[in-house]
Amino acid sequence: MRFDGRGEGSLREVRITRNYIKHAEGSVLVEFGDTKVICTASVESSVPPFLRGKGTGWVTAEYSMLPRATHSRSPREAAKGKVGGRTHEIQRLIGRSLRAVVDMSLLGERSIIIDCDVIQADGGTRTASITGAYVALCDALQGLVAKGELSSLPIREAVAAVSVGIVGGVAVLDLNYVEDSAAEVDMNFVMTSSNRFVEVQGTAEAEPFTIEQMDAMRTLAVDGIKQLFQIQQAVLAR
């Protein structure tokens, strides 16, 4: 039993609220326990220079945190004049994850810009961002279909993500901040609804981990992501 009462294989309470931002083509507030992220999807009728004239689209992402999303204030990266390495890594991960499930040839020469803004951080902000951004992306693309700008939804399948780790020698799912800070191993899994992996990130913070521990974490992640797909599907069906 974990300190918050969850079992080793239990997600935190996950909620996804659609149409959270008035002006965005797609938007959600995604909550994994006390981690809260606003994800928006904006449609632009242009593509990066390397795609111009090729008749294909693009999906990319930006990620940021409010200065007081964490226990102590962090200066805005805009004030520093550059994007930090962690931020750059996370926003590239979000973009890759979403591009993995979009048929760019059906999107036409359009870009979908995903913005993930963490308003409260308690572990798992990148995995929550991916899971919520998928729903915002679906809403933005469905809007293009409804307006007749796309003939069909260019989504191949769903994508979601979750964290796992080894805490106190035990494999656990969906780590919060306290667990993440104490974890001997920290991993993130990104998967599609056809049970394929988009990305697996893992680091031993203390002792190296065994194949058996890796298998235990993978099993927890696969089961947890299946639950996230069900949540996404239920939210999109409303």
Swiss-Prot record:
Family statement: Belongs to the RNase PH family.
Subunit structure: Homohexameric ring arranged as a trimer of dimers.
PROSITE patterns assigned to the protein according to its UniProt record, in alphabetical order: RIBONUCLEASE_PH (PS01277)
Keywords: Nucleotidyltransferase, RNA-binding, rRNA processing, Transferase, tRNA processing, tRNA-binding
Species the sequence originates in: Geotalea daltonii (strain DSM 22248 / JCM 15807 / FRC-32) (Geobacter daltonii)
InterPro entries: ExoRNase_PH_dom1 (IPR001247), ExoRNase_PH_dom2 (IPR015847), ExoRNase_PH_dom2_sf (IPR036345), PNPase/RNase_PH_dom_sf (IPR027408), Ribosomal_Su5_D2-typ_SF (IPR020568), RNase_PH (IPR050080), RNase_PH_bac-type (IPR002381), RNase_PH_CS (IPR018336)
Molecular-function GO term, any one: 3'-5'-RNA exonuclease activity
PANTHER family: EXOSOME COMPLEX COMPONENT, EXOSOME COMPLEX COMPONENT RRP41
Primary role: Phosphorolytic 3'-5' exoribonuclease that plays an important role in tRNA 3'-end maturation. Removes nucleotide residues following the 3'-CCA terminus of tRNAs; can also add nucleotides to the ends of RNA molecules by using nucleoside diphosphates as substrates, but this may not be physiologically important. Probably plays a role in initiation of 16S rRNA degradation (leading to ribosome degradation) during starvation.
Major enzyme class: transferase
Source superkingdom: Bacteria
This protein's name: Ribonuclease PH
Biological process according to GO: rRNA catabolic process; rRNA processing; tRNA processing
Keyword Oxidoreductase on entry: no
Catalytic activity: tRNA(n+1) + phosphate = tRNA(n) + a ribonucleoside 5'-diphosphate
Gene: rph
SUPFAM superfamilies named among the record's database cross-references: Ribonuclease PH domain 2-like (SSF55666), Ribosomal protein S5 domain 2-like (SSF54211)
Residues reported in the UniProt entry to bind phosphate: 86, 124-126
EC numbers, comma separated: 2.7.7.56
